[in-house]
Amino acid sequence: MDNKKRLAYAIIRFLHDQLRHGELSSDAQESLEVAIQCLETAFGVTVEDSDLALPQTLPEIFEAAAAGKELPPDLRSPQETPPSEEDSAEAERLKTEGNEQMKVENFEAAVHFYGKAIELNPANAVYFCNRAAAYSKLGNYAGAVQDCERAICIDPSYSKAYGRMGLALSSLNKHTEAVAYYRKALELDPDNETYKSNLKVAELRLREAPSPTGGVGSFDIAGLLNNPSFMSMASNLMNNPQVQQLMSGMISGGHNPLGTPGTSPSQNDLASLIQAGQQFAQQMQQQNPELIEQLRSQIRSRTPSASNDDQQE
């Protein structure tokens, strides 16, 4: 593979990371975005070309070179000379032990065993991918992303590495990149239902990214208030004499004209308010079921599924 493209990809990836975490001024961010576009155009490379990824990031390569140190085994490029039979067998044993630790949710121990396996055989993509799963369980999503990148570099056709990369990126709220990796995973494994489901979730989260005038979380209040159907039904609700009477009583200091003997005004207020809300919801469901489904999608808190990816190899 063209090393110039690998280098260009490493630089583009570094610049993308600086955009997200570099705490740069708006002018500096704009300059970086222009630089990224120029590099992508000049070399025909984008940040989604993960098959160009090296086992180590550009800062890691630089730090190791500046310190005059050799990269640790799990950051080196895959060895040209395959490991001995003894090392391969021991690495498999360590991997199996790591899998057992995952089953009992001892994720730190799993990371340890997978790391030992990598030291003996750093050319095995499965070891990196399994450790990525353990890192994700520990909440170390950056470590998971890094290990998935290494697994993909070793085996660009390894669908599970792309799927786990998508999970880690989703957990970091990097939904644009997550979508790209889920699509690649599906390209390699088209019948995988977990990848299909996770792709839909990532695409939904991407669409539901909060707007500047949005409400709490991903609920877009501005969009809702601009919906003619919603505003029409809300207007009808507020013109309902029962609702007007209820609101008038609440505003005037708690006197409830709808009260009944033996029931406190606050209880009647709550019951009437619930009843009015139910009527409004029923009206919305009958007149605009599409809007109801849209609201449900916005309110529903959904997370990607790791069910298929919990299976260690």
Curated annotation (Swiss-Prot):
Keywords: Acetylation, Chaperone, Cytoplasm, Nucleus, Phosphoprotein, Repeat, TPR repeat
Localization annotation: Cytoplasm; Nucleus
Post-translational modification N6-acetyllysine, affected residues: 137
GO molecular function (one): molecular adaptor activity
Phosphoserine: residues bearing it: 77, 84, 301, 305
A GO CC annotation given for this chain: membrane
TPR repeats: 91-124, 125-158, 159-192
Region (Disordered): 69-97
Domain of life: Eukaryota
Post-translational modification Phosphothreonine, affected residues: 81, 303
Pfam families: SGTA_dimer (PF16546), TPR_1 (PF00515), TPR_8 (PF13181)
An annotated GO BP: negative regulation of ERAD pathway
Predominant location: cytoplasm
Gene3D superfamilies assigned: Immunoglobulin FC, subunit C, Tetratricopeptide repeat domain
InterPro entries reported for this sequence: SGT, SGTA_dimer, TPR-like_helical_dom_sf, TPR_rpt
Keyword Metal-binding found: no
Similarity field: Belongs to the SGT family.
Subunit structure: Homodimer. Homooligomer. Interacts with DNAJC5 and DNAJC5B. Interacts (via TPR repeats) with HSP90AA1. Interacts (via Gln-rich region) with SLC2A1. Interacts with HSP90AB1. Interacts (via TPR repeats) with HSPA8/Hsc70; the interaction is direct. Interacts with BAG6 (via ubiquitin-like domain); interaction prevents interaction between BAG6 and RNF126. Forms a multiprotein complex, at least composed of DNAJB12, DNAJB14, HSPA8/Hsc70 and SGTA; interaction with DNAJB14 and HSPA8/Hsc70 is direct.
Function noted in UniProt: Co-chaperone that binds misfolded and hydrophobic patches-containing client proteins in the cytosol. Mediates their targeting to the endoplasmic reticulum but also regulates their sorting to the proteasome when targeting fails. Functions in tail-anchored/type II transmembrane proteins membrane insertion constituting with ASNA1 and the BAG6 complex a targeting module. Functions upstream of the BAG6 complex and ASNA1, binding more rapidly the transmembrane domain of newly synthesized proteins.
Name of protein: Small glutamine-rich tetratricopeptide repeat-containing protein alpha
Organism: Bos taurus
Upper classification of the organism: Eukaryota, Metazoa, Chordata, Craniata, Vertebrata
